[in-house]
């Protein structure tokens, strides 16, 4: 019987424990974690994501503010705003909601955010630290949350064969390095890969992040595998499905995540955790309790 991994419950449990640690930071260290989110324009999906992040932050004791800027803002004006937040010692985390308008360079914006305040973990320096396996860095939230879900089923991943489908900088590539650090043998597949089914059929762990509904078929998955579905796709007038054939794989996999209610809540939980880690690092407080 397949275990359906309840990402919402696991995320809520994490945030409850994090809230207790935030209370300690406030009481004993006079640290009041603060997250600033920059939203460009009025993309409905982005508005929902940002609202969910702010709601969760406030519920666990993180001060949060969303700064809404017009869609036609100049790139240099946005950079100036980010630099203001970089220089504000009361701000510990800065998140610029993606995607950005076409006239703005995402790379320049991401790398303008201070390395220590980069709670998305997208800054080139944080990416480099992840690749090197350093622990005291900010790691992208979705891969970090996905790994936590995998380890909720199986703690020791050493020697496991893992397949990551998708090579984005946000999910696929950092997921590859996180699994590598767990001593997995990792294969990353993408749009130009051949024989995807063959690779997946040998995998103990499959992480799907391609943005294509029901892309991963049941006959690709070996019995007893752990399947993490990062995708969230809208089909049939608002119905949400993931990147894997949930009904087909259920009963075959050892464990799998649903969509919604799997990886999504974990992404927000680890954004909260990254904000607290960032506050600790900036204030010289040992953040080891939050980095595991």
Swiss-Prot record:
MF (Gene Ontology): methenyltetrahydrofolate cyclohydrolase activity; methylenetetrahydrofolate dehydrogenase (NADP+) activity
Coiled-coil intervals: none
InterPro entries linked to this entry: Aminoacid_DH-like_N_sf (IPR046346), NAD(P)-bd_dom_sf (IPR036291), THF_DH/CycHdrlase (IPR000672), THF_DH/CycHdrlase_cat_dom (IPR020630), THF_DH/CycHdrlase_CS (IPR020867), THF_DH/CycHdrlase_NAD-bd_dom (IPR020631)
Catalytic reactions on record: (6R)-5,10-methylene-5,6,7,8-tetrahydrofolate + NADP(+) = (6R)-5,10-methenyltetrahydrofolate + NADPH; (6R)-5,10-methenyltetrahydrofolate + H2O = (6R)-10-formyltetrahydrofolate + H(+)
Annotated metabolic or biological route of this protein: One-carbon metabolism; tetrahydrofolate interconversion
Amino acids binding NADP(+): 166-168, 191, 232
Cellular component GO terms, alphabetical: cytosol
Record EC number: 1.5.1.5, 3.5.4.9
Function: Catalyzes the oxidation of 5,10-methylenetetrahydrofolate to 5,10-methenyltetrahydrofolate and then the hydrolysis of 5,10-methenyltetrahydrofolate to 10-formyltetrahydrofolate.
Oligomeric form and interacting partners: Homodimer.
Family to which this protein belongs: Belongs to the tetrahydrofolate dehydrogenase/cyclohydrolase family.
Stated name of the protein: Bifunctional protein FolD
Provenance organism: Wolbachia pipientis wMel
Organism taxonomic ancestry: Bacteria, Pseudomonadati, Pseudomonadota, Alphaproteobacteria, Rickettsiales
Gene this protein is translated from: folD
């Amino acid at each position: 019987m397949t275990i359906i991994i309840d990402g919402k419950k696991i995320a809520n449990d994490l945030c409850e424990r994090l809230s207790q640690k935030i209370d300690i930071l406030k009481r004993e260290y006079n640290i009041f974690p603060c997250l600033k989110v920059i939203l460009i324009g009025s993309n409905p999906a982005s508005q929902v994501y940002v609202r969910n992040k702010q709601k969760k932050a406030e519920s666990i004791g993180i001060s949060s503010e969303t700064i809404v800027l017009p869609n036609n803002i100049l790139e240099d004006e946005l950079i100036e705003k980010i630099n203001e937040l970089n220089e504000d010692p009361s701000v510990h985390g800065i998140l610029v909601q993606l995607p950005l308008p076409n006239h703005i360079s995402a790379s320049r914006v991401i790398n303008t955010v201070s390395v220590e305040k980069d709670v998305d973990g997208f800054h080139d320096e944080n990416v480099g630290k992840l690749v090197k396996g350093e622990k005291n860095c900010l790691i992208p939230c979705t891969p970090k949350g996905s790994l936590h879900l995998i380890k909720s089923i199986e703690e020791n991943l050493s020697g496991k064969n893992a397949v990551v489908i998708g090579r984005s900088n946000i999910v696929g590539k950092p997921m590859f390095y996180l699994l590598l650090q767990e001593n997995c043998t990792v294969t990353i597949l993408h749009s130009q890969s051949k024989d995807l089914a063959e690779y997946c059929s040998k995998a103990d762990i499959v992480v799907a992040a391609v943005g294509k509904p029901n892309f991963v078929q049941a006959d690709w998955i070996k019995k007893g595998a752990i399947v993490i579905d990062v995708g969230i796709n809208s089909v049939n007038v608002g119905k949400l499905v993931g990147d894997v054939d949930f009904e087909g794989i259920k009963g075959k996999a050892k464990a799998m995540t649903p969509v919604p209610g799997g990886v999504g809540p974990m992404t927000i939980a680890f954004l909260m955790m990254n904000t607290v880690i960032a506050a600790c690092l900036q204030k010289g407080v040992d953040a080891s309790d939050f980095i595991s």
